[in-house]
């Protein structure tokens, strides 16, 4: 989402990034202890680097960062460079076409999008948009353990004993 925003800014197009978390890349922070399998050169977008250059940012050296390093050295500075275009605590709860529903479908593709937003501690609001990029990822909606994308037998009943997260086994002593 942040990199897409940098590309749109280069094209002088209006952009809003809606981040459900209270910080940049909040989902990545939850697995910040995990080392990525991509080198820095594959993780830094060219348009984002150009936007960051104006802030005095320097690209990280080559290597394989952890999620926390990716945030600290790149994603957080990029979010800062985007400024108030990034709205934190703004969970998207729906995207629809203006004036269209399951019964009224004619001309659907010609209508702007309506983005339904639920802010942390506030009242829901809506934004009109010509285009929407969903960069939310799958962190909050992990795949179930069963076949065919469905929960395994007994998975729902055992939900309070299951975790789909990446454990952190580092010694913190």
Segments the model singles out, each with a brief description of its role:
Residues 1-16, 164-173:
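Rossmann-like dinucleotide/flavin-binding elements
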Residues 4, 27, 97, 143-145:
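Short glycine-/acidic-enriched loop or helix-start segments at secondary-structure transitions
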Residues 11, 32-35, 148-154:
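Glycine-rich, phosphate-binding/catalytic loops in enzymes
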Residues 14, 85-87, 160:
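Conserved beta-strand segments of alpha/beta enzyme cores
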Residues 21-73:
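Glycine-rich active-site loop/strand segments that organize a redox cofactor
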Residues 58-141:
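Feature captures the FAD/FMN-dependent oxidoreductase FAD-binding
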Residues 67, 136-173:
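Glycine-rich dinucleotide-binding loop and its adjacent helix/turn
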